[in-house]
């Protein structure tokens, strides 16, 4: 098998070539080998101009080899750790006189050179230990057999290697701008806005670049593959093959596939991954997320948690080569949740409260005098609102309130009441709240169970309509208003205007029909009727009835649309 790979290496060394100094690149053969990832995974040969991904078992070194045929050859080698720190070194074993380019086509001589380098320690050119993306670059390298040795002492890990003899023309990694930092331009409780300088690879060289943003709570990442390794830590990709199977321990094609698939055509196991350049939203893990945003260099991250430290990394990906470069990441702590201001309620005084959609509001009621009972009148002007009442930390009440509700609680000397209001998902809410220890004097106007306005169809004329509504046993003032509306006025439009807290003072004087007092001790007879005159034939009108209580506080009945007859 080893001889077979060295034969493949020989195919990359045509004697007539004088430009490439690593295995000379036959483009057609090179592209074929790029597609066949198994060639790289199984081979210890580094091809010229292609990124190799492979795996390291802990404390088990891995060696790669490549040949440089001529002196004064440019050479660049880049190693990218994808998880654990690596120890790696690059060594050179000079060629013997009998192993010149004239004899480079003989696989036996190449095999001898490799064996000599294994047996005899060569000249160390470069070494590094850490988890940074590090590279060796030489504008003039001697001919010889080069060995790259990698070791992971912490844990099993994987990495990437890229080598080329044409570093100036290849440029597969996107170039960083003169200022490679990611800037936090603004941040709040749940959002952070990031900005960075565009890559010259996109702005000057006009190569396709995509930016990917990685957000996590632990630390910044130095490479995109390190971030993706963290995201995929639970995937089968990291599961080592089971012992006893016929596999090369460094053959990545088997990793992550069940045993019953190992006998299938290996070409099915080596399908190329999708281009990173597409708009891919990775399935987020617990504390890390990657979002690719195209060629924009400003991005706002939302839905963050308040008072939490986040780390932000930006990677630019060359969508032609699928290779990436990291900006210098940033971190910031989001702002604390704004402390809720508590509204003080005065005994017997109506307080207007506005609650944002899904928002919260806190109110406090501390009666000055001793009391036996406390009454809360809560008027939800539109949609339902969740109400909680606590006294000295103890929960007394928790209900959804729609319309007008009255709650009477047993009092306690020097008791302090905390009211929490929580808005719903539909939209913002407006309420009127009255807390009192003397409910008989400061009650909201009482309402019947049915607050609809009924129109009598048989009593309709071209200029009038007759309507009726229910009252209560308490003598109250009722005011009725009318407003002409379009014939296609819908129920949805009517609901949008159904703010029960808007009183008669918000209506035009021309819309007022009349006001009258009404009550009945017999609830069965607590019905009043009214005929509204001076209307136009065939027109639609919106009718509203308001009941006014002590202190001028009013409540609106459900609106009613009526239509006069067109022909009489």
Curated annotation (Swiss-Prot):
UniProt entry tagged with the keyword Transferase: no
Single biological process term from Gene Ontology: negative regulation of endothelial cell apoptotic process
Keywords from the UniProt entry: Glycoprotein, Neurogenesis, Repeat, Secreted, Signal
UniProt GO cellular component terms: extracellular matrix; extracellular region; extracellular space
Description of the deletion phenotype: Knockout mice lacking Ndnf are grossly normal and able to produce viable pups. Absence of Ndnf in 13.5 dpc embryos results in abnormal development of the olfactory system and defective gonadotropin-releasing hormone (GnRH) expressing neurons migration to the hypothalamus.
Entry keyword annotation includes Cell cycle: no
Post-translational modification: O-glycosylated; contains heparan sulfate and chondroitin sulfate.
Cross-referenced SUPFAM superfamilies: Fibronectin type III
UniProt-listed InterPro entries: FN3_dom, FN3_sf, Ig-like_fold, NDNF, NDNF_C, NDNF_Fn(III)_1, NDNF_N
Molecular functions per Gene Ontology: glycosaminoglycan binding; heparin binding
Chief localisation class: secreted
Compartments (UniProt record): Secreted
Function of the protein: Secretory protein that plays a role in various cellular processes. Acts as a chemorepellent acting on gonadotropin-releasing hormone (GnRH) expressing neurons regulating their migration to the hypothalamus. Also promotes neuron migration, growth and survival as well as neurite outgrowth and is involved in the development of the olfactory system. May also act through the regulation of growth factors activity and downstream signaling. Also regulates extracellular matrix assembly and cell adhesiveness.
Assembly information from the UniProt record: Binds heparin and chondroitin sulfate.
Name listed for the protein in its UniProt record: Protein NDNF
Source organism per UniProt: Mus musculus
High-level lineage: Eukaryota, Metazoa, Chordata, Craniata, Vertebrata
